[in-house]
């Protein structure tokens, strides 16, 4: 069976997007692994399957698959690419600029600009330690963590996945490859943690590198950018709208404060289209 696909990327985070709204396709884990293989398949960080919505409140659904064939919950860069894909393929009614996309965890609101960036409602940050999860006696803006013989100060935030955020003087010389994995697997983070290294340039501009749990440093991490801005706001360093420069490019994050949702704006671009045989 031949399946049409679109290769897309957001800040260097690349995806193979498949239309399962208009073509019947349910790839198996083995087929997902083949699609994602950079030597023998198309190659990507994740495979996205656009599907009909199951809930009446949603316009479309989508499924996310990792290169090993397992299913993921949500991806900020991925949902931006999915929304751009749906619009480019003519699946979004003319004049519509806001969509509700169903994930396995809930609903995600997306705003489209004509041939430009995509804005995603990333939900409200979770700050209570048991729900991050993070072992601490009570919620605080900043925590101390003993790691590798030193005490580091960090913020702890969940954006649907856990994040630790450290402030550094210079992200270029930050110990991402050593301190990242040490914090990632620290016993106070029972489900491990993504680790962000944030350099504050101004109250509206930061640089960020993220060591992702189970993956190492990546070019871009949408939830990591959201967590960094939330933590920076709580610690009094940042304003409501912040430009976040990652190795793969720039995201713009808006967070008005406690109880409010985080909004992320960034690029979503088509690289090429093609067909792949799935046997």
Curated annotation (Swiss-Prot):
Output the Gene3D superfamilies linked to this UniProt entry: Diaminopimelate Epimerase, Chain A, domain 1
Q: What is one process in the GO biological process aspect for this record?
A: lysine biosynthetic process via diaminopimelate
Chemical reaction(s) catalysed = (2S,6S)-2,6-diaminopimelate = meso-2,6-diaminopimelate
Q: Where does substrate bind?
A: 13, 46, 66, 76-77, 161, 194, 212-213, 222-223
Q: Which PROSITE patterns match?
A: DAP_EPIMERASE
Q: Where does it live in the cell?
A: Cytoplasm
- Single GO MF annotation: diaminopimelate epimerase activity
Question: Disulphide bridges in this chain?
Answer: none
Q: GO CC annotations?
A: cytosol
The EC number(s) given in the record are 5.1.1.7
Keywords assigned: Amino-acid biosynthesis, Cytoplasm, Isomerase, Lysine biosynthesis
Record pathway: Amino-acid biosynthesis; L-lysine biosynthesis via DAP pathway; DL-2,6-diaminopimelate from LL-2,6-diaminopimelate: step 1/1
Q: Location of site Could be important to modulate the pK values of the two catalytic cysteine residues?
A: 163, 212
The family database entries (PANTHER family) matched by this protein are listed as: DIAMINOPIMELATE EPIMERASE, DIAMINOPIMELATE EPIMERASE, CHLOROPLASTIC
Q: Which family does it belong to?
A: Belongs to the diaminopimelate epimerase family.
- What does this protein's UniProt record list under function? Catalyzes the stereoinversion of LL-2,6-diaminopimelate (L,L-DAP) to meso-diaminopimelate (meso-DAP), a precursor of L-lysine and an essential component of the bacterial peptidoglycan.
Quaternary form?
Homodimer.
Protein known as: Diaminopimelate epimerase
């Amino acid at each position: 069976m031949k399946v049409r696909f679109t290769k897309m990327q957001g800040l260097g985070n690349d995806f193979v997007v498949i239309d399962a709204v208009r073509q019947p396709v349910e790839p198996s884990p083995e087929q997902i692994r083949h699609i994602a293989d950079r030597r023998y398949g198309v190659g990507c960080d994740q495979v996205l399957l656009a599907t009909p919505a199951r809930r009446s409140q949603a316009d479309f659904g989508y499924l996310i698959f990792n290169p090993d064939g397992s299913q993921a919950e949500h991806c900020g860069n991925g949902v931006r690419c999915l929304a751009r894909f749906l619009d480019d393929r003519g699946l979004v009614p003319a004049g519509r600029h806001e969509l509700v996309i169903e994930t396995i965890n809930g609903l995600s609101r997306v705003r489209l600009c004509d041939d430009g960036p995509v804005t995603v409602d990333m939900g409200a940050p979770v700050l209570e330690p048991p729900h991050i999860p993070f072992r601490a006696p009570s919620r605080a803006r900043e925590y101390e963590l003993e790691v590798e013989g030193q005490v580091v100060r960090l913020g702890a935030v969940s954006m649907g996945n856990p994040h630790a955020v450290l402030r550094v003087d210079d992200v270029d010389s930050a110990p991402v490859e050593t301190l990242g994995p040490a914090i990632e697997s620290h016993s106070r983070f029972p489900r491990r943690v993504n680790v962000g290294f944030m350099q504050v340039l101004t109250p509206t501009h930061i640089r960020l590198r993220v060591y992702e749990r189970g993956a190492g440093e990546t070019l871009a991490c949408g939830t990591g950018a959201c967590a960094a801005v939330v933590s920076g706001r709580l610690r009094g360093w940042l304003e409501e709208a912040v430009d976040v420069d990652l190795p793969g490019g720039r995201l713009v994050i808006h967070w008005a404060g406690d109880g409010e949702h985080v909004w992320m704006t960034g690029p979503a671009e088509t690289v090429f289209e093609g067909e792949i045989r799935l046997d």
